[in-house]
Amino acid sequence: MSTNTDLSLSSYDEGQGSKFIRKARETPFVPIGMAGFAAIVAYGLYKLKSRGNTKMSIHLIHMRVAAQGFVVGAMTLGMGYSMYQEFWAKRKP
């Protein structure tokens, strides 16, 4: 019974940084989506001063749609990449 607890507790020994790096290697498009989201939000907030005649609510909606579009695109590419690796790349013996 102690071996079961040892196996389940081994995931808690892993630090946050090493866990993030391991997950990033398993699914590389998730950190790309997160970085793109952060970059689009930062750029949108930077451009908030010089938005011109545009209402703030419209500017924020455009920023949200762009960030969501980037994340959905990264998720779609990641799904396609995973499907490629699982079904087509491993077929060659």
Curated annotation (Swiss-Prot):
One of its GO terms (cellular component) is nucleus. It is a multi-pass membrane protein. Associates with cytochrome c oxidase (COX, complex IV); proposed complex component. Also associates with respiratory chain supercomplexes. Residues 90-93 are mitochondrial matrix. It is found in: Mitochondrion membrane; Mitochondrion inner membrane. Residues 2-93 form the HIG1 domain. This is HIG1 domain family member 1A, mitochondrial. Keywords: Acetylation, Electron transport, Membrane, Mitochondrion, Mitochondrion inner membrane, Phosphoprotein, Respiratory chain, Transmembrane, Transmembrane helix, Transport. The modification Phosphoserine is found at residue 8. The modification N-acetylserine is found at residue 2.
